[in-house]
């Protein structure tokens, strides 16, 4: 997999102080998968990071400088499946976000599954096309199903492939109405998420959301082409695709 289509950072969070012995089994495992974050960007923009975020991970964590997977032209789905399974697409089966279904001669999403209904969406989804286990599945095995596994992502393929076969829930943004949605394949769609959708989801707030640089444009020294043209995007100004564009932005 060429130079960082997706950067994935595994964070193991332990209770207690650093001076205390670490437990043999972590209580919390958090995986952050950032689409399109090239590895060299981590260094290029390091001066803009806070001390407790990426800087701490790179300073105190394990950093692999030559991590590659032997396949070409990755996209979001194939890369996510590879990161979570440790296998190439020829083994885990997710060759792309979409492919041609030879039986119907129509495009098929990699997590499309008519056997399950959607929550807050008309999309039918499951990880049935994923042919291997994932780190999420192995966590359920290691804890004898006592561990809880949830995946949250802007797009359904990323959420479903991250949650794996045994996850408790996978949630993503409905690009039509801005609600968090899911699939009946997974056993849980929490009541608090229902309440959030009914009162506080992004469709109630999108008119007030504006995408702008966090810092002064002049501080982004590696983006010289943009330094004379301030970037500002108002999502409400686009009637049809505003939730899709919000999901593809860093603000989600």
Region locations from a protein language model:
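Short, structured active-site-proximal loop/turn typified by the sulfatase FGly-forming signature C/S-X-P-X-R
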Residues: 43-91, 148-152
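Generic recognition of stable, solvent-exposed alpha-helical segments in well-folded globular domains
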Residues: 32, 37, 49-52, 78, ...
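Cytochrome P450 catalytic-domain "roof"
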Residues: 22, 62, 127
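Bacterial Sec-dependent N-terminal signal peptides
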Residues: 1-25
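Extracytoplasmic/secreted cell-surface and envelope-processing proteins
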Residues: 39-43, 76, 159-162
């Amino acid at each position: 997999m060429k130079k960082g289509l997706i950067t994935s950072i595994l964070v193991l969070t332990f209770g207690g102080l650093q001076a205390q012995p670490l437990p043999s089994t972590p209580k919390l495992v958090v995986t952050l998968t950032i689409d399109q974050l090239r590895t060299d960007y981590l260094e290029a923009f390091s001066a803009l990071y806070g001390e407790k975020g990426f800087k701490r991970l790179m300073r105190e964590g394990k950093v692999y400088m030559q991590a590659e997977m032997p396949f070409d032209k990755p996209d979001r789905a194939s890369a996510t499946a590879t990161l979570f399974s440790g296998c190439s697409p020829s083994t885990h089966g997710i060759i792309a976000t979409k492919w041609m279904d030879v039986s119907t001669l129509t495009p098929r999403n990699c997590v499309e599954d008519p056997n399950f209904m959607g929550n807050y969406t008309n999309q039918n989804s499951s990880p049935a096309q994923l042919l291997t286990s994932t780190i999420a599945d192995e966590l359920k095995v290691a804890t004898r199903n006592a561990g809880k596994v949830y995946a949250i992502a802007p797009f359904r393929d990323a959420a479903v492939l991250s949650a794996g076969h045994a996850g408790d829930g996978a949630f993503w943004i409905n690009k039509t109405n801005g609600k968090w949605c899911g699939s009946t394949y997974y056993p849980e769609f929490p009541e608090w998420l229902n309440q959030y959708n009914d009162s506080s989801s992004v469709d109630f707030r999108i008119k007030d959301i504006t995408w702008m640089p966090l810092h002064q444009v002049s501080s982004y020294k590696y983006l010289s082409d943009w330094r004379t043209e301030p970037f500002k995007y108002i999502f409400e100004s686009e009637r049809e695709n505003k939730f899709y564009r919000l999901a593809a932005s860093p603000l989600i």
